[in-house]
Amino acid sequence: SQAKIQMGYELSAMQEKYIKINNLQVSEKLSNFVNDELLKNTNVSSENFWSGLEKTLDELAPKNKELIKFREDLQKKIDDWHIKNKGKEFNLDEYKKFLLEIGYLKNEGPDFKIETENVDEEIASIAGPQLVVPVMNARYALNAANARWMSLYDSLYGTDVIEQSEDSVSERYDPLRGEMVIKYGRDFLDKYFPLAGLSWNKITSFAVKYGKLKVLKGADIFDLEDENKFVGHRGESDNPSAIILKNNNLHIEILKDSRAFAAQQDHAGISDIILESAVSTICDNEDSVAAVDSEDKIICYRNWLGLMKGDLKSKFEKEGKLFERKLNPHRSYISKDGKGLKLHGRSLLLVRNVGHLMTNPSILLSDGSEIPEGIMDAFITTAAALHDIKNKNNSRTGSVYIVK
C-alpha cells in the first residue's frame, strides 16, 4: 500500500548517515561512492560535481515541483470532466477540444527534421529488438548486454518455434528435433541469403576466394544471389571457421566446426547460426527496480558504472558450480577485402532515469526535503558514462542515451 511505501521511505531516511556538502545533506555512502569510484579517472573533480549538482537543484527542483503540480491540476480537470459527463454519449470532438483548452493536448506543429548529431547506428539506422533490464541486478544486466549475438539453434531447440510432438519428447538430446532445427536454419538462409542455383539445404562446404563467398555442393561452386551480403570470415579462407553475412544492417554468423556436437548431423559441418539479436538494451532505474535509499541506489549506479567501464562481473552458483559472468568482447573477423573487421560484441546500452514524481532520501536539500530522484539519476548516470565516452566501448560516437 501507499502507506507502507511511505513508511519504507521514512525508515530509509532515518537510517541514512548524512554529511554536509555545501548546502546539501548527502548520504555518506553515496558521497563515498561518487568521490572514490564514480569520478575516479574522469576530469570532473568532486568539488565541481557537488557544486554543479547544487546549482542545478536550486534551479530545477522548484521547476520539478511546478511540473508535478501542473500534472495534478490536469488530472483533476480530466477527472471532473468525466464525472460531469457521466452517462452522456461520448463525443470525441468535444473531448479533444476540452483537452486542448486545458493544455493536455497541443496543436500539431510544422514538420521538422531531427538534427541530433553523434547518434550510433543502433539508434539511427538498425531496426532490431530492444531489451529492458533492471540495472539493480548485475547478472541480468550482463545477460542483456551480451544478448547482441544469440544462437539460432539454441533458440529453436529450446522453444516452441518448432512444434514438438509427444513422440519426440525426450530428456536427452532429441536427434529428430535436431534435424528440424537444422532444416529451419537452412530455410532461414534460403529466405534471406539465397544462393544462385542451389538451396542451403544441399551445400557441403564453403570457402572464400578473392573476397567472395563460394558455396560448394561437392565439386560444384555457387555464389550468393546478392554478393554484397557477404561481409567477411574467420579462420583460413579455404576452410573458414565462420562466415559473416548481413541483411538489413543485421549480421548473422555461420559457424563451421565438424567436431562440435551440433555438427554431427550436418553434412556441411555447420555447428550453429548466430544471429545479431538485441541491438540495444535499456538499463532501467525505474519500473523494474525498487531503490528506496542510498544503499539501493548505489547498487544501481555501481552496476551502470561497471557497464560503462566494461568491467562489471557477476559470480553465481548453479548446480553446485561457481560461475562468473562478464561482458562479451567485440567480435573479430577478416573483411572481404582482407583487412581486419570488428563488430560490436554487445548491445548498445541506454539508461533509464526515474521520472519527475519520485524523490529520494539519499540527498536532502537545504530545507530538509528529499532530492528529486530524476535529477540525481541524471547527474550520476551521465558521470558514469564519461568513462565510456573516453574509451568508446559502448557508444562509438561518444554519446550517452538517457531514457526518461
Question: Where are these predicted regions, by residue range?
Answer:
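N-terminal amphipathic/basic-hydrophobic helices that include classical n-h-c signal peptides
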Residues: 1-13
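N-terminal-proximal low-complexity accessory segments that begin disordered
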Residues: 12-106, 114
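Catalytic alpha/beta active-site cores
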Residues: 12-17, 94-97, 101-404
